[in-house]
Amino acid sequence: MKVNKIMTVKLLLALVIVFGATSCSKKSSSKSASSATGWKINDKKGGFQFNSKYKKQATSPGLVFVEGGTFTMGKVQDDVMHDWNNTPNQQHVQSFYMDETEVTNKMYMEYLDWVKNVFSPDEENYKNIYVGACPDTLVWRNRLGYTETMTNNYLRHPAYADYPVVGVNWIQAVEFSKWRTQRVNENILEKEGYLKKDAKITEVKAESSFDTETYLNAPSKTFGGDEKIVLRGRKGSLAKPKGGKDAKQPKNVYAQRSSGLLNPEYRLPTEAEWEYAAAADVGQREYNIYKGQKKYPWSGSYTRSSKRQVKGDQLANFKQGKGDYGGIAGWSDDGADITQVVKYYPPNDFGLYDMAGNVAEWVEDVYRPIVDDEVSDFNYFRGNVYTKNKLGDDGKVEIVTAENIKYDTLPNGRIIARNAPGQIAQVPVDEKETYLRQNFSTSDNRNYRDGDKQSSRNFDLGSSDEGDKIKDNQRMYDSPKHNVTTDSLGNMVRKYDKSNKRTSLVNDDVRVYKGGSWKDRAYWLDPAQRRYFPQDMATDFIGFRCAMSRVGPKADKKKTPRTK
């Protein structure tokens, strides 16, 4: 009897061991062999090569992970201003990353320093690039207030180094985000041995600056085609081979998108992302439900802290009342008169600082009075303009040079570079991409269903020969159209639109900004509040922070009953 029991136990153990070995074998072989063909992946003899060791997206400098989900976008409080521009609707955002703080003066000064060193304003071809990147420091001026100290010192003085940058328009914020993308990815490639060490400092110049898309699409043209930089890394073909009889030349000369090394681009957050991250309802989650609705980025209905040590202190930097920007001497409520150093106030439940107060923030979206949730309730965003790489006569991508930099003269007369040497020239998508396509039919979708010809009350089915053009007197949003021209001597001539028939300030060039600021009352601290401002203008109370999309799984952690 005992013998039978022993044999039975041994048999069961043998089966468990065999089953475990089989499953382990299957698990290990799934990465080394193709599930489609059974062929070996990453064979030393050649064939399909793939990064089977990729784990997850690395968190880029300055960012905090924000797990996506569903939420109620829009204002659920009383609309005392009667704007009626943020009706509640249910939206879902994917997981993403967002800057822990607003972009500071020190961060922006690093950008200006790089631009000035690479694109010297003393050279004729580049003289407008640096000037176009500089913030407008005159935004601090007040007709009936003495603010010259901020005008002269706020951006560059070390006392304000960790204060949020202001005077930056939406276009400049976008350009900063692009620059940041290139510098971070350039640093990654250097660390991984794909670029020559320190070349980003010692050998960078206007004609040979790094661009991520150029590196991925035409790597031999990166750094102006200088192979000494691109191929001198540890993994480059020009690198010195290791000694010994088994020394071999490296295979991976260039990193590719499939390498998984390069991160997605830094960008401005969409309005939906910003509002979701600011509200941080995750702090009130219990299992799969939010217990209540937040009025501010913190819990509770008041702007003051209830913690014993700091009881009564304001949780954000905002205007307390008429003529009161921070309380009385010796007992300041929020510790600031104007802006405040970042990380001064507690973060919200996502670990993000100053999502209410300090400065309002640009987001990516073009403004419209409604959020069209009938069309989209997933990653909602208005402002898509689809482009493609420009191809030359030889069928290869065309790289921007010093001779063909495109400049835009903004309605306010400022000149800003649209591209820079080393980048791939872009053109709008055309019929080749849109023919018989259902999800989009044109390059510019900023006014889709709200300002385009089809949504206009003057839309006439019989006038298709005019295409999508709308007559000036039939625009849904009849906003002013200022004009900037150049006379025969090259002087800029600025003309104001003095028509008294204009009915709106809304057009395709006004952008949403979110959150309250040091100049706003508590009403604007609600994450659902939305306002708009021309994308080419700046103020002393609007700053910005960057975001980055998440690739791969929604989250790294498993479900928990409550957020910890």
Regions found by a protein language model. Give the residues of each.
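Functional-site microenvironments in short loops/helix caps that host divalent-cation chemistry
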Residues: S28-D43, F65-V66, T72, Q77, ...
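N-terminal low-complexity, Pro/Thr/Ser-rich intrinsically disordered segments
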Residues: G38-K56
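Hydrophobic helical h-region of N-terminal Sec-dependent signal peptides
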Residues: L11-V18
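Short, P/G- and charge-enriched loop/turn segments at secondary-structure junctions
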Residues: N51-K53, D83-N86, N500, R530-Q535
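Catalytic loop of the DD-peptidase/beta-lactamase superfamily, centered on the K-T-G motif
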Residues: Q529-Y532, M537, I542, M548-S549, ...
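C-terminal motif of bacterial Sec signal peptides marking the signal peptidase cleavage site
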Residues: G20-S23
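A short glycine-rich, aromatic-capped structural motif
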Residues: K55-T149, A161-V184, G357, G543-F544, ...
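Bacterial N-terminal signal peptides that target proteins for export
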Residues: K2-L11
